[in-house]
Structures are given as C-alpha cells and as structure tokens.
C-alpha cells in the first residue's frame, strides 16, 4: 500500500525534495518519469504521475502524484 509523503516541487511540478523522518532530503537526479491512467471506465479512475528519484543520501525512491486528488505517495515494491 502506498504511503503518503510530503514533497517540495519546482515550478514545473517535478519533486526537488522529500520529507523523511530526519527532515528534508534533496533530490539529486530525476532518473525516470512516466504517467499511467487506468480504470477510466469506472467511478474511481486512476491517473498518476510517477517519478523515480535519486536522493542526496544515495537512495533511489519512486513517488507518485495522484493527479485526481493532488496527493503524493511513496511507491513500495515487493
């Protein structure tokens, strides 16, 4: 299940920092960006913008914005 995450954005809407338990971490590099739209035929469609990010502490993380709500989440795999 995705976990809510606080994100700082640049003017183009791309994440530049994420809030972690220890405070804000800067994004060093945008590794990948893609969008997905699904379930458009239902009452609860899905529209998300995904960003794979390299953080200043060396971790790679994937976050997405629910484009219908505007909320941001960390995507966990596995």
Predicted features and spans:
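Non-catalytic peripheral regions of nucleotide-handling enzymes
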Residues: 1-78
